[in-house]
């Protein structure tokens, strides 16, 4: 899902950089509010995200896809804004030092994988957790989040022939199904299984991370 240089035109790239500036600002403010006891876990999860993004899963159509870990971070930190800054740091490092994703497309990549993915995944999880439990809800959230991010990336590709010809040549009818397919059948299921397993394990060893803010406040008041 890392968009390389040359696929998005300069107008699109500039647009996403402008969008991400206030989002990064808000994310940094949210990070400063994070419980200091969660910071070591955040560091581990950010490193985990870096690792899983480096492993590409083969897709039957000849392409590859990869997990991200944004929904997992959002769930365990109970804050998708924190996931945004964590994933953005990973993507910036990968673009600059590993050539994975273009420098010009950092804004777009951070929007797709650092905003769309964790926010969609986190709120799907929140909607479902009281109905099916944290473990299953986390897996579904991770699946929906990564597929949503892939579809948004597909729309960005498909928009180029209309607004900036000379960059990605594929229309929506090609780009969106291609991106969705790769993540529906490989990265999506992988993200769902891995996220659910990690949430299950962390729930056993750190159940306090799954105590809602309301429950914490009522416990203090009691």
Swiss-Prot record:
GO cellular component, one term: plasma membrane
Record-annotated membrane-spanning stretches: 3-23, 39-59, 81-101, 102-122, 135-155, 180-200
Keywords: Cell membrane, Membrane, Transmembrane, Transmembrane helix, Transport
InterPro entries: CbiM/NikMN
Membrane topology: Multi-pass membrane protein
Main location: membrane
Top-level division of the source organism's lineage: Archaea
Subcellular location(s) per record: Cell membrane
Any one biological process term the GO annotation gives: transition metal ion transport
Family: Belongs to the CbiM family.
Role of this protein: May be involved in metal transport.
Protein name: Putative metal transport protein MJ1569
Organism whose genome encodes this protein: Methanocaldococcus jannaschii (strain ATCC 43067 / DSM 2661 / JAL-1 / JCM 10045 / NBRC 100440)
